[in-house]
From Swiss-Prot:
Biological role stated in the UniProt entry: Together with IFNAR2, forms the heterodimeric receptor for type I interferons (including interferons alpha, beta, epsilon, omega and kappa). Type I interferon binding activates the JAK-STAT signaling cascade, resulting in transcriptional activation or repression of interferon-regulated genes that encode the effectors of the interferon response. Mechanistically, type I interferon-binding brings the IFNAR1 and IFNAR2 subunits into close proximity with one another, driving their associated Janus kinases (JAKs) (TYK2 bound to IFNAR1 and JAK1 bound to IFNAR2) to cross-phosphorylate one another.
UniProt protein name: Interferon alpha/beta receptor 1
GO biological process: cellular response to interferon-alpha; response to lipopolysaccharide; type I interferon-mediated signaling pathway
One GO CC annotation: late endosome
Extracellular topological intervals: 25-437
Residue positions the entry lists as glycosylated: 47, 55, 85, 108-109, 172, 222, 285, 313, 359, 377, 434
Alphabetized InterPro entries for the sequence: FN3_dom, FN3_sf, Ig-like_fold, Interferon/interleukin_rcp_dom, Interferon_alpha/beta_rcpt-1, Type-II_Cytokine-TF_Rcpt
Residues covered by region (Important for interaction with TYK2): 492-501
Organism: Ovis aries
Recorded name of the encoding gene: IFNAR1
Leader sequence residues: 1-24
One annotated GO molecular function: type I interferon receptor activity
Lipidated residue numbers (S-palmitoyl cysteine): 464
Domain Fibronectin type-III: 126-226, 231-329, 333-433
Post-translational modification: Ubiquitinated, leading to its internalization and degradation. Polyubiquitinated via 'Lys-48'-linked and 'Lys-63'-linked ubiquitin chains, leading to receptor internalization and lysosomal degradation. The 'Lys-63'-linked ubiquitin chains are cleaved off by the BRISC complex. Phosphorylated on tyrosine residues in response to interferon-binding: phosphorylation by TYK2 tyrosine kinase creates docking sites for STAT proteins. Phosphorylated on serine residues in response to interferon binding; this promotes interaction with FBXW11 and ubiquitination.
Amino acid sequence: MLSLLGATTLMLVAGRWVLPAASGEANLKSENVEIHIIDDNFFLKWNSSSESVRNVTFSADYQILGTDNWKKLPGCQHITSSKCNFSSVELKDVFEKIELRIRAEEGNNTSTWYEVEPFVPFLKAQIGPPDVHLEAEDKAIILSISPPGTEDSIMWALDRSSFRYSVVIWKNSSSLEERTETVYPEDKIYKLSPEITYCLKVKAELRLQSRVGCYSPVYCINTTERHKVPSPENVQINVDNQAYVLKWDYPYESTTFQAQWLRAFLKKIPGKHSNKWKQIPNCENVTTTHCVFPRDIFSMGIYYVRVRASNGNGTSFWSEEKEFNTEVKPIIFPPVISMKSITDDSLHVSVSASEESENMSVNQLYPLVYEVIFWENTSNAERKVLEKRTDFTFPNLKPLTVYCVKARALIENDRWNKGSSYSDTVCEKTKPGNTSKTWLIAGICTALFSILVVIYVVRVFLRCVKYVFFPSSKPPSSVDQYFSDQPLRNLLLSTSEEQTERCFIIENASIITEIEETNEVAEVHEEYNSQASQDSGNYSNEDENSGSKISEEFLQQDSV
């Protein structure tokens, strides 16, 4: 038992006590005085330097603080060793302070008393290891745990039903696959494999006091071979209007089922509870994998249910026990999510109730909160937030980026974390930012400029092609100016006309003078017309012949 000591000890460094020095005797002294309390076991231990002195014993007294009534400490009188057990001391109250004193003795000689600092037994007590009993099934182990101490323990009399037990279990063949579970005094460990040796150890805890006990010794047991009739699995209980619906999975037909219930608080009380399970109405000898029973069977509280199967070959073990709370069991459907981009760096999210949700009392009786998971579509990094509002905004986002969101409804301040499944995932892209607009405008302008440049280059290219392969029938103006004089225009006349000489018989000299003046005017007019027609590239004989026509007219008039 002393090997278990060490977590909660009272260690005192005592001064020496000295026996009267006699002839050949040495001084006697004590060094570390320690008090250990485990459950209802009390131990006093000290170190002494008087081993070389023979016939030295030690005795201790105790008293309740403030009574001034020292009594001999049972089990600690005339002790020759350096420890004693005073568990037989009769203490009426473990919350009262106790004083201890100890001295050394040799014959009729005694040292002075050394008084230990007063202590409260309950505050110094260490929780001891619980006692464990095991029973095996094919896929489970039944635990029966006795609280630390004895049935009439004074130390834990008020806490026997407050203990919680932590179990560490592993396969005997591999200690690396350890699994830790919190269990009740009468409980089961599920999800095991048939015909496997499992080992476990258990420790007790008082969570409200933050006190943790010692582990029990290691216990090992073999699970049985696979049972011929398997147990039902995936037991669930839901609410449908004014009734409960209990469902489970089972692989075979032609099987009957039975379901039972138990109040949850009974599992906290040590002892057997197999006879306290009660039959659920309408769930006995049913041939379907579900049964329906009225809600008024259960008052407000927490319960456990279990199911087992039967056929002509036998009866299965009980299924895994399912806990449910009558206050929060109504079904919560997943919400409907919508998301809209409002700016370049924010998205607005709206949460609404599902159309399938018919039990509106859930929203009225229990306030809901929404667990929202938000992430960038190209990233696995998720942001999880709890929102009481049905409309909220995610700010500080990237422009032109796709974000996704999903959510589920939870009952606020629910310690069992009951909630719906997650909604469908909704994704939305943020709007372009100012920088994006600037780049967009710049891109459009660049594209337009590029188009104009391309058009200009194409036109120049086409003109070059036309000039090379399809030249104009008219000579250019620079060439045409050399052909603007009168002698050159005569080249365009026919050969016959060029070789013809015109002769005139002039009888009146005055007419000749008028004709010459007229010809001078015509020449001036011709020169003007020639300059005006150089750019057009057109050649005309009209001006060239105008002089001759005028001369002919004058001749005709003269002849008349």
